[in-house]
């Protein structure tokens, strides 16, 4: 079988080692290059040792072509010549010859002895013959000085690695385990964000952080609206109670005065005094106070209500002329304009409205803010 190192011995093909010419083995070894594997030297030494102990015919004499597989070389008869493992003296002789040839560049004695003994105890041989077996031309061990070692065969699967995207954290598939639960959790969270986004009026942005911020402001606004409506209902109820108490007191005082007038004239004076004393003192109603802030992409509204006074701050970006639309919205809400001021800061137009609520008008802060944003954004 062909070996790349055999090319180094092509100039030595003409040399023949006849029976009884063991001195030629040393000459051939001295002429070999340093890159040659020492297994070939061992083969030549084995041929010389076998030639000194066995007589053979001229037709069966081993040559260099015999060891390296010449093109016209026929395999020898099985019984003509057999090569066995060298004895211990030949081992040491071959190692010493290699060490002298390399001139001190040979590996340390311990490593060389271990490598040599590993080969001499039974190197790779073909079945039924004693010729050396060289690896294929593409084997890495063919270009190394030392015992033959076959490189591991590559994996047939293509060597693809599993990534964490195709395999679970614990070896499971992507549809099982932690990744499946995480995917379901994210889907539920996205559905909740979408539902919350639909409940918020006048959203500024669509990202999750802004949605949460708008939701917090809207919840606080709803709480203030509930308090404001509660105060309005309580105030209206107290007004009705006060009107009912005055009517009842006046009726009872008139009946008592008529009874006493029949008896004496002094009873009329006492009835008049009793009529003035029957009217209960007015109760102090709770003060109505609330505020709301609403914003859209280009509009900001701040509404503050204290009793019947409504103070409105309107901020509009990148566009002027929205004052007429805001005035029409205040008229629709039945708010009387008391004072108006305005200005411009950068690209923002700011207006301040001081208004009053009509008596009996059910106006609250959230309705004012929503109406102003709706009208100004459409302008």
Curated annotation (Swiss-Prot):
* Region (Helix-loop-helix motif), start-end ranges: 187-222
Gene3D superfamilies, alphabetically? Helix-loop-helix DNA-binding domain
Major location (coarse) = nucleus
**What keywords would UniProt list here?**
DNA-binding, Nucleus, Transcription, Transcription regulation
- Top-level taxon of the source organism: Eukaryota
The record's annotation in InterPro entries points to: bHLH91-like, bHLH_dom, HLH_DNA-bd_sf, MYC1-like_bHLH
Transmembrane stretches in the record are none
Q: Where in the cell is it found?
A: Nucleus
Q: Cite the CDD domains for this sequence.
A: bHLH_AtMYC1_like
Residue intervals of the bHLH domain? 173-222
The record, for PROSITE patterns, names: BHLH
One Pfam assignment: HLH
**What is the tissue specificity?**
Highly expressed in anthers; strong expression in the middle layer and tapetum, and weak expression in the endothecium.
Query: Residue ranges of region Disordered?
Result: 144-184
Tell me a Gene Ontology molecular-function term this record carries: protein dimerization activity
Result of knocking out the encoding gene: Has normal vegetative growth, inflorescence and flower morphology, however has smaller anthers and does not produce mature pollen grains during reproductive stage. After stage 6, during which anther forms four somatic layers, the three inner anther wall layers remain undifferentiated. Meiosis progresses normally from leptotene stage to metaphase I, but is arrasted at anaphase I and no cytokinesis occurs at prophase II, resulting in degenerated meiocytes.
Q: Which GO biological process categories is it annotated with?
A: anther wall tapetum development; regulation of DNA-templated transcription
- Provide the residue span(s) of the region labelled Basic motif: 173-186
PANTHER family recorded: TRANSCRIPTION FACTOR BHLH91, TRANSCRIPTION FACTOR TIP2
Q: What is the protein's known function?
A: Transcription factor that binds to the E-box-containing promoter regions of the transcription factors TDR and EAT1, activating their expression. May have a role in specifying the cell pattern of the inner anther walls and functioning in meiosis progression. Required for male reproduction. Acts downstream of UDT1 and GAMYB, but upstream of TDR1 and EAT1 in pollen development.
Q: Which family does it belong to?
A: Belongs to the bHLH protein family.
Q: What is this protein called?
A: Transcription factor TIP2
Q: From what organism does this protein derive?
A: Oryza sativa subsp. japonica (Rice)
């Amino acid at each position: 079988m062909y070996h790349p190192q055999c090319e180094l011995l092509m100039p030595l093909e003409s040399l023949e080692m006849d029976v009884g010419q063991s001195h030629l083995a040393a000459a051939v070894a001295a002429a070999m290059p340093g890159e040659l594997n020492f297994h070939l030297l061992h083969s030549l030494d084995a041929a010389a040792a076998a030639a000194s102990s066995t007589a053979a015919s001229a037709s069966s004499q081993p040559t260099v072509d015999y060891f390296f597989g010449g093109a016209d070389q026929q395999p020898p008869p099985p019984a003509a010549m057999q090569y066995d493992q060298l004895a211990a003296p030949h081992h040491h002789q071959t190692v010493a010859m290699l060490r002298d040839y390399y001139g001190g560049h040979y590996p340390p004695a311990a490593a060389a002895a271990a490598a040599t003994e590993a080969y001499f105890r039974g190197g790779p041989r073909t079945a039924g013959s004693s010729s050396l077996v060289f690896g294929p031309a593409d084997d890495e061990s063919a270009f190394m000085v030392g015992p033959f070692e076959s490189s591991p065969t590559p994996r047939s699967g293509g060597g693809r690695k599993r990534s964490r995207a195709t395999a679970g954290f614990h070896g499971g598939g992507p549809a099982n385990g932690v990744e499946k639960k995480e995917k379901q959790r994210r889907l539920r969270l996205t559905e909740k964000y979408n539902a919350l986004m639909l409940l918020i009026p006048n959203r500024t942005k669509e990202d999750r952080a802004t949605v949460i911020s708008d939701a917090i402001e809207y919840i606080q606004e709803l709480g203030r609206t509930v308090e404001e409506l509660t105060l309005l209902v309580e105030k209206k109820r107290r007004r009705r109670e006060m009107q009912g108490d005055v009517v009842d007191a006046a009726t009872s005082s008139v009946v008592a005065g008529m009874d006493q007038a029949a008896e004496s004239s002094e009873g009329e004076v006492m009835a008049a005094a009793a009529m003035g004393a029957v009217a209960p003192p007015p109760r102090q109603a709770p003060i109505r106070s609330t505020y709301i802030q609403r914003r859209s992409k280009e509009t900001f509204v701040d509404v503050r209500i204290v009793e019947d006074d409504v103070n409105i701050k309107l901020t509009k970006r990148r566009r002027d002329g929205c004052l007429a639309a805001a005035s029409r919205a205040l008229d629709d809400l039945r708010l009387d304009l008391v004072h108006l001021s305005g200005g411009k800061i950068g690209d923002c137009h700011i207006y301040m409205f001081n208004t009053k609520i009509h008596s009996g008008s059910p106006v609250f802060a959230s309705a004012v803010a929503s109406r102003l944003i709706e009208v100004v954004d459409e302008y």
